[in-house]
Amino acid sequence: MGGAGILLLLLAGAGVVVAWRPPKGKCPLRCSCSKDSALCEGSPDLPVSFSPTLLSLSLVRTGVTQLKAGSFLRIPSLHLLLFTSNSFSVIEDDAFAGLSHLQYLFIEDNEIGSISKNALRGLRSLTHLSLANNHLETLPRFLFRGLDTLTHVDLRGNPFQCDCRVLWLLQWMPTVNASVGTGACAGPASLSHMQLHHLDPKTFKCRAIELSWFQTVGESALSVEPFSYQGEPHIVLAQPFAGRCLILSWDYSLQRFRPEEELPAASVVSCKPLVLGPSLFVLAARLWGGSQLWARPSPGLRLAPTQTLAPRRLLRPNDAELLWLEGQPCFVVADASKAGSTTLLCRDGPGFYPHQSLHAWHRDTDAEALELDGRPHLLLASASQRPVLFHWTGGRFERRTDIPEAEDVYATRHFQAGGDVFLCLTRYIGDSMVMRWDGSMFRLLQQLPSRGAHVFQPLLIARDQLAILGSDFAFSQVLRLEPDKGLLEPLQELGPPALVAPRAFAHITMAGRRFLFAACFKGPTQIYQHHEIDLSA
């Protein structure tokens, strides 16, 4: 061994530290370097002239304002990188690109308020990460994607806002083998000082929906009904001024709805479809000229009129509904004339024939078929009395009860949620109502101001139970059922364009997209698209 080597061994044995100076130009100003490590303090910018074999680098109180992409490409051998008491506030994407051997990354006691979602990309050997004591209010989703070797993460000392932006972090923590120190929330006020790991992700409501305008169908309409035929969704509109039932289908080339077939039907108020195997039926309820049944026996044929329905009973139909009784399809047509009567029409052979007359002389405006306690029921609304509930027994409908405190109800629609049956009752002026079935009676649950309402339509779209309250004088309101409260809460207004005298709403899923149809009496039918928005993104 040479003399210099022996001297170094003796000095080391005596406890004397001898700083190793790399070749000239390999230890920047304001840095202290040893053979495999460097400490830089007070440097005005990011030092770069290090030995390419450097293993450890500490940067303290530098003048760096941000870490840009590729900041450490010249020292790919780093195993440890430490930042403390620096003034930089932003870490950009790929700031640590090229550091595939880095195991320890400590970014502590700095002024970082923003870190890009791909800032840590490529750190495939990282085991220890600390972002403690910075100014981070949130972290971008997927920040830790690809960091499969992490064993320790320290996020303490940051003023996290515990809103939807941290939801992904709460969901991520249980899925990794790393120990994670998260610290406490700085806000909102209701969660201030609560430890992040005590938060329940299930309590966060971070999903929003929006209905945005998609398409206009020119003529006005009174009803809109979805149906599926030969595996393809369709819509049929009752267009009284155009004198037809218009069937729409999806144009896959133009990505829009287009007319497929129309059925001449003067003064039509409702077009009700029924699919039985290869056969398609459409009931066209008309104010004048008699209601008709149209049929298509098999695909490839056009719909053709096959039957005039109960001409002596259906004098002024106002609504038509489809229901199944003892395995057979039936239509119920609500008749609004004093001389006519609401009629139940059931299939018999090739046609549909009167099975029962209901509620004569009451000028019914609406019929709603529903199931209560496992049995078919029918609810009729009329201009002369409160809605009446009928139940199916002995092969016919018998009166069961009426709905208390429900005067001047124009129409009723029901929906199910959480095992309960709810009822939406439409009133033109005053308060429309939401009721819930208690096993023997519908009880009032909620009242909503009506301003010229002819429709209060519940719709289940994706995971959301919605209800739309139409208005002839203002914007129609979309409401959503909040499961925690069991009440409908305002979601949005429909428009622009504003709906002009809306009369019916329907939902259809087409090509993986969800659409809402709004049939309007004094304006064109409007189509809206349903969008889901992730607020935690």
Curated annotation (Swiss-Prot):
Recite the UniProt keywords alphabetically.
Answer: Disease variant, Glycoprotein, Leucine-rich repeat, Repeat, Secreted, Signal
What residues are glycosylation sites in this protein?
N177
Domain LRRCT, residue spans: 158-208
Under the heading SUPFAM superfamilies, the entry gives: L domain-like
Residue spans of the EAR repeats: 210-252, 256-298, 302-349, 351-394, 396-439, 441-483, 487-532
GO BP field = adult locomotory behavior; glial cell proliferation; myelination in peripheral nervous system; neuron maturation; regulation of myelination
Which parts of the chain are LRR repeats?
Answer: 53-74, 77-98, 101-122, 125-146
A GO cellular component entry from the record: extracellular region
| Compartments where located | Secreted
- The stretch of residues making up the signal peptide is 1-19
Q: Which domain of life is it from?
A: Eukaryota
Task: Quote the disease note of the record.
Answer: Arthrogryposis multiplex congenita 1, neurogenic, with myelin defect: A form of arthrogryposis multiplex congenita, a developmental condition characterized by multiple joint contractures resulting from reduced or absent fetal movements. AMC1 is an autosomal recessive severe form with onset in utero. Most affected individuals die in utero. Those who survive have generalized contractures and hypotonia. The disorder is caused by a neurogenic defect and poor or absent myelin formation around peripheral nerves rather than by a muscular defect.
Summarize the subunit comment. Answer: Can bind to ADAM11, ADAM22 and ADAM23.
Its annotated function is as follows: Component of Schwann cell signaling pathway(s) that controls axon segregation and myelin formation.
What is the official name of this protein in its record?
A: Leucine-rich repeat LGI family member 4
